[in-house]
């Protein structure tokens, strides 16, 4: 290669040497000029680069760069501003739409306000018109009632509410005999609250007491001791005459009339005295019910009326005292005749109402029937003038509760005529409760029990559909209970069969005795194949089951042959208890079988463990005896809930308990308290169950 190169170089040199003489001097000048121009251009380039570098490092250049950046940013800001303006214009349009909608709503609300005011004015006008119309109708009704000779308050009380006062769980009749005296309506002064003062300190004669309405206080059974005011016809009002204005302490119309009758009437003392005593009892009970707080509230509510009429109150008290001194026997005979006549009319109205409502009694509720019947009888007894005895009525709530308790507890019923007489003696009041007592006895008695109808109950045949309905319901319940009994029997058979198969599979090498497989319908145990000692065991179980059935309270119906009722006479609840007793018998028999099986298993397990661990130390024997004792204790616990007869028989028979010598006799454990606690008791181990599977 060097030679080549050298050779090459020598060739070029030869060419240049050969061509050098051919070049002219102008060529060299041209080359020199070009080289000089190249140097000058390079020099200028370097100068320009230096200037550019210096310019870039100067503040002016930086300012220009910043200005360019700011101009670019300004352009971006202007663009975003333009977009924001467009968006704001859209928002303004939307706001304008919302504003127009709100203005439309405000106009609508103004219209609604106008309509509201118009409607309120219309409602007020209608209320005033309704009040005026009600006042006119009340006045017309009162005038008609006065013309007919019947008090308007009593006429309203017959149709609107029940005139009864419930106090301390007792219902007392509050119908006043003022309904028989027709007087003029002179004033109608409503008051917010009123108090009841001494009934013997404000007696008036028939000439001065212009009473036009009876004061009947009604309270609910739920709030009989918590009411704050006395309600009269749904409102708190009291009607008195001009001579007896309303004050903070005013007498009810009923009390004034009855005090008048008690003080002045001697010829008709029987009827009027009984009514006066009822009124006295009513007001004494009301005085007890009205607590001091209620009295204070009444005084506060009526303070304005008392302050305005204080002078009138003083004059009224003086006037009453003067009339009290001059009170004499001035009651006319016409009052008694009108009283008897109105009582007969009232009784006739009640009988007609009873006949009209008798068709609905068969389809109504039993409680409503009893309440209506009791209410009618109380009103009839209160309005009649022939009775001279003071009778205290029993409240409807108490009667309903007693009847429900008697219906829901068939085990406490009395059979035959003795039970009927006892119930009649518990509910009797000579004439007042005879029909109701017979109705309750008919409802509570068995459907097929033979009883002669009472001559005092002409409406008794109307209640026969209830007996038929109860009979059909009893048959349905009986069929349902029989189906449940059959299901329980089949399930128990299945369970006993499975357990017997399981036990026989485990102890097939040690036992040849067959378990019972069939349960008889008479709640006893019937052996499929009696073998050896199983016969005596099952006989004992049957005796125990029958003894349990005789002793248990739920099976008293099946065990009492002297009641004189057939199986069809049983009510549904008694049928259910009968089937429940059968299921309990089967359960007790099953427990006895389980007890005998577990005891035999414990015996076999003990023998097997003793044979296997006879050569081991005390630990093995302890384990063996504890296992056997656990099984035995389970058996005794399962049989501890048996009948009392089985326990007594086990106490009478000689008992052989199973004890492990390794645990009780040869054990080194000195803890005697634990041994005493774990030691099985003698009366829990019957002697004839220990070799159940032995052949």
UniProtKB/Swiss-Prot annotation:
Residues 263-274, 282-297 have a biased composition (Polar residues). Its main location: cytoplasm. Phosphorylation at Thr-391 by PLK1 is not needed for centrosomal localization or pericentriolar material expansion but is indispensable for spindle-pole stabilization. Residues 1-12 have a biased composition (Gly residues). The modification Phosphoserine is found at residues 667, 670, 672. Keywords: Cell projection, Coiled coil, Cytoplasm, Cytoskeleton, Phosphoprotein. It is found in: Cytoplasm, Cytoskeleton, Microtubule organizing center, Centrosome; Cytoplasm, Cytoskeleton, Cilium basal body. The modification Phosphothreonine is found at residue 391. Residues 29-57, 102-132 form a coiled coil. The keyword Zinc-finger does not apply. One of its GO terms (molecular function) is protein kinase binding. Belongs to the kizuna family. Centrosomal protein required for establishing a robust mitotic centrosome architecture that can endure the forces that converge on the centrosomes during spindle formation. Required for stabilizing the expanded pericentriolar material around the centriole. This is Centrosomal protein kizuna. The lineage of its organism: Eukaryota, Metazoa, Chordata, Craniata, Vertebrata.
